[in-house]
Amino acid sequence: MLNFSDRLIESIKKKNSVLIAGIDTSIENVPDYFIKRFYDREKSEIDNLKTILFEYNRRIIDAVEENVVGVKFQAAFFEQYSYHGFEVLHKLCEYAKNKKLVVIFDGKRNDISSSAKGYSNAYLGETPVFGRKIRFFEFDAITTNPYLGQDGIKPFVEDCERFKKGLFVLVKTSNPSSADFQDLTVEDKYLFEVVAEKVYEWGKNCVGKEGYSDIGAVVGATQKEAAKRIREILPNSFLLVPGIGVQGGKVEDLKYFVDSNNMGIIVNSSRDIIYAYKNYVHSDFEKSSYLASKSIKESINAAIS
């Protein structure tokens, strides 16, 4: 089996795209006509919720698959519906994998080593059950929080090596208050630089045949100045770049995120794709999402070519 980074590069070349569709759907943003179409008064509200969430997101995936290399499922938008949401997440993960898309779990997980191992078992590896190992999810990669240090990251890295999976560590995020901690100085370096250096160390043993590490970084699209420095520290890592569009990141700034080969990034867009119907004159959300993903893909390609 190919390393995660090699599989990602294959998909990028095949699709001529570095775009990731973020699946961050809340039921209140699903069009009313779609809810009415699937709402069954003979079923419980929970059953209707699960059906509508799955069917809406499934159609989004179908609509954008031509223009994206993968999908990123934001855990919070499924956790808010308790275990019912995770039932939907499990089905959508399988659905996207069957579409040959790269599938990322955006859970920003971490904890002390034993707990981190549980998270890694769930989303990257295998979980021991009655003397055998069971794989519950088929994600290709996961986002993690580095705050607990190496022992909290180690289980994820080990599973990346063993199962050819990927890891994206939070380094410099797109939210306005990211500077509260990430821009603090440690021995004349910003804290985000120190974290990036750790990411480089953690990824040394997870390098694919194309020369890229399977351990990458999350760097917000609003952080172009930081991105320049992070790219110097991580010359052969993929950067997962959220925050273009609604969050204020500019497509034209992506040139500061790519490596010397104009590679090394995947760019997430969520609301501009999954709720694109709000910005188009017609009400066909599938067509709107297709057109939005195509437009974003082309804009990104123009910016980094």
Swiss-Prot record:
This is Orotidine 5'-phosphate decarboxylase. Its EC number is 4.1.1.23. InterPro entries: Aldolase_TIM, OMPdecase_type-2, OMPdeCOase_dom, RibuloseP-bd_barrel. Pfam families: OMPdecase. Pathway: Pyrimidine metabolism; UMP biosynthesis via de novo pathway; UMP from orotate: step 2/2. The keyword Repeat does not apply. Keywords: Decarboxylase, Lyase, Pyrimidine biosynthesis. One of its GO terms (molecular function) is orotidine-5'-phosphate decarboxylase activity. GO terms for biological process: 'de novo' pyrimidine nucleobase biosynthetic process; 'de novo' UMP biosynthetic process. The keyword Lyase applies. It catalyses: orotidine 5'-phosphate + H(+) = UMP + CO2. The active site is at 108 (proton donor). Belongs to the OMP decarboxylase family. Type 2 subfamily.
